[in-house]
Amino acid sequence: MTGNSIRMGPQSFRRNLALLFIGIVTASVSGAQTGDTSDSEIPYSRKGADTCLACHDDQLSLAIFRTKHAVPSDPRSPFGHGQLQCEACHGPGGAHSPRVRRGQERPSVIEFGSHEETEVSVQNDNCLNCHNTGVGFGWHGSSHDDDEVACADCHVSHAPRDAVMHTSTQPDVCFDCHQLQRSETLKAFSHPFFEGKMDCSGCHSPHGATADAQLVRQTINDTCYQCHAEKRGPYVWEHAPAAEECTLCHSPHGSNHPGMLTSRAPLLCQSCHSQSGHPSIAYDADGLATGMPSQYLLGQSCMNCHEQVHGSNHPSGSKLMR
């Protein structure tokens, strides 16, 4: 002994080393027996995407290399320098990739789609790890989130052309679930969805919004005014229903009446203007002095005279006739 130090002989050193080894092995076996294998302990594969592509070499899997998710020069991409490649989205594959013995089941990784084993919340949280600003900012608490819609139900991350991201194909993706709205767009008068000139996200924010029906603007009218700016006003003579809400008179997805009206005039007008003696009351030929059909039943009915139905700036336009 020299000072406070202890000199250990060769035999003592070997004995202590053996005891340490036994302790490590015992702890490892104990951990295995208790099933202590949390996700954080699952190793990543040693060769990254090369390991995955040894099996997943079909066209759907390889298509990822033609998307923004696999751009080596973009540090934000899962395939950017130093990133985890396939495992950035699908999770650690160290337990999934090794060869399994006959009769054993290969441990799964994160799979995407509402019909997969992975919980939808886990799938979506994985997407939000990157898409956590902009479109993903209002996701939590949105109607799609509450209904457990998976990101992969609408988006195809491996597709070079994601259908929901393009105006001409987006409505068909939305209509897979929103079938009532699809039926309305097939009526005689509708917005130009099937002409590829308009998509659902022009009015609705699919990733969440504070407005009703997840509108992109706070009110129905402000949403409509994005395209129909000439109806905004302000007018000297306002038509109260038009200023209150466009959908009081119009069906936004489609209608069998011109102008996408909820019903034809004069019936639409009479839902408000029904007081006794008002000229908008529809008379048949028998109720008229001339015995001829009423002008209020022909053509645009009330709008033959009251043509400025959204409002008028004319000094004498109080009746919306000019």
Describe each model-derived feature in a short phrase.
Residues 1-13:
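N-terminal secretory signal peptides that target proteins for export/translocation
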Residues 16-28:
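Bacterial N-terminal signal peptides
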Residues 31-322:
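Short sequence/structural segments immediately N-terminal
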